[in-house]
Amino acid sequence: MIFLIDHNLKGHALVFLGAIATQGWLDIVPMQFVTFAEMDLSINSDDRTVWRLAQENQMILLTANRSMEGKDSLEQVMREENTSESLPVITVSNADRLLNDSEYRGRCVESLVEIVLDIDTYRGARRIFIP
């Protein structure tokens, strides 16, 4: 599974992916994290553009801070464009704890792996908060 890492989680993603690898999950569940830069996506892109790019490329958007209000907010885009086949957006509930709390980070890893292993169950779910 490929994850599009929101620009506000770029540094966090390194720690997160390291925890996934340390726990041995990458040997069992192929996962790849890609950045906005790797996708030629501006960090100033609106949520509609980001969501569409992720869906078109079969990537799960991993974020901690996307807008909830406005015509191009992530929430509005998902209401308008989400289908039963859409991949969910995964939102880390507390990005600071992801960096600083190994127990919390471990729970985030478990949640992420569970979602990937059973991705078809989560299609169409719009947004999933972890942990």
Please describe what each predicted stretch is.
Residues 7-26, 34-44, 73-131:
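Acidic, PIN/NYN-like endoribonuclease modules and their adjacent C-terminal/linker elements
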Residues 1, 57-59, 117:
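Short coil/turn segments at beta-strand junctions that form active-site/ligand-binding loops
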Residues 2-6:
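Short hydrophobic beta-strand segments
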Residues 47, 55, 59-80:
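Acidic, metal-binding active-site segment of PIN/NYN-like and related structure-specific nucleases
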